[in-house]
Amino acid sequence: MENIYLLMLVALVALAVADLVVGVSNDAVNFLNSALGSKVLSFRTIMIVASIGIFIGCVFSSGMMEVARKGIFNPGEFMFNEIMIIFMAVMITDILLLDFFNTVGMPTSTTVSIVFELLGASVAMALIKIGMDNGSFSDVVNYINTSKATQIILGILLSVVVAFSIGAIVQWISRLLLSYNFETKPSWVGAVFGGIALTALTYFILMKGIKGTSYAKESFDLIGGVTIKDFLENNVFQIVIYTSALMSLLSYAFIQFFKFDIYKIIIAVGTFGLALAFAGNDLVNFIGVPIAAWQSYEAWTASGLAANEFGMGVLATKVPTPNILLVCAGVVMVLTLWFSKKAKRVVKTELDLSNQGNIEERFEPNFLSRGLVRLATNSSNLFSKIMPDSVNNKIEERFRVPETFTKAIAKEDRPSFDVIRASVNLMVAGILISIATSYKLPLSTTYVTFMVAMGTSLSDRAWGSDSAVYRVAGVLNVIAGWFGTALIAFTAAGTIAYLINISELMIAVLIFFAILLLVRNYIKGKKVTTNGVIEESLVIAESSSLQGVIHESAKNIAKLIKRGNKIY
């Protein structure tokens, strides 16, 4: 029987590599969105900055691996054979679930997926054990960390409301103060904005960067004999004040003397920070389970006991993750970032929803999106009636969109939004995640970054009268997908754990089935990409002739009428 668990371990290692690929493909949107959307940095520069952030974040993520070992279930209640079944069920489910979201181009939370997969598989195994012992359903609480699921669900709701609201408010104020003609403002204006943004991002990088390192809990005489983590958390006000002054002076020097674009620096630093946070936090979602399985296997083989007699209390102890594994994971993640086409598909979804210009909308409007748009429109009209005309005219002038987003320029050269919105996206996301880290709140980086981007899009008037119902419908679809992730992850992992428990042969069947689905999704995705390229080339070829222009204009008019019918 020892061979079956060795084979399971080998399978888990292979699944870990695949999970890294599908996981990075989905989570890349969190840190690439702002840089790619603003188009102020070259694609190569963006990828290099993000790659460095990911690699450093991976090395710093050792402390986060405890989540897969004891964060969701109580390992001492399970035997080695049961733990291995739970881990197999989790990894198979995770790959299929994330690949599905990648294929349809929808962002989701890898944290929520892994948490609810662990929860579903461990609940299923607990119920099997309870049934065999003739226990009661209430005994499940002895096996499961029930408070964790509640925290995650509350985290989803909190992320959606808070991130969206704060993003919208900060963007509205930023646009009101800076307008779209921010380049004509005095140097000190850009310096103050740069100082605030870089301070937020620096604190964010420090909070997220040191959290998983071995230095986080070490004390140093230089900072009064306290740990770095405690120093950062207990001296927030002083750190922010001093850093803001320093960063504002540096920003002024960059603008005035070195003629640097401070917004490029903000976007580069923000991209690095979010990439570092993603790798540091989310690496556990991809390799935490296989590493826990490997450590369980080592402890079991050393014990000399039968698999169904060896309790897994060993997982409750803290065991450091070998750095070589973290480095290897970092290499896989960086390679995936550079070569994954599905990552670009997920990024496109978020960029389309936040685009300042007119695009071909992907999502169809529904009664809920129409209702929300009407409510927002009526509220805006009421606000306009209350305010004096002079104030309204001043606001309109500040929010007047430049030709960059409206004139007919090549689609590939047109930015989705400007550097002010990109900077606000990164700054607000960094602040919210830093606060969540400080107070140990279970906020997902995916939820925060996505909802901040949607909030800034709303207040920046990217959702016009003709596109609002489409964009709101898209946001609602993504949010529904988040809740669907939790439900599907819990149910599927529990079902797979039950099937594997019936017979270990089901592992081979399930892995074969998973491979078939992955190949099918890959082929399907490739066909969609190819068809898109062919269709685009045909439109360009037609537009070069007079008749082609007439046909294209007719299509646009038909689309406009159809869109008007859907809106009203």
Each model region followed by its residue ranges:
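Alpha-helical transmembrane segments and immediately membrane-proximal extracytoplasmic
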Residues: 2-441, 449-566
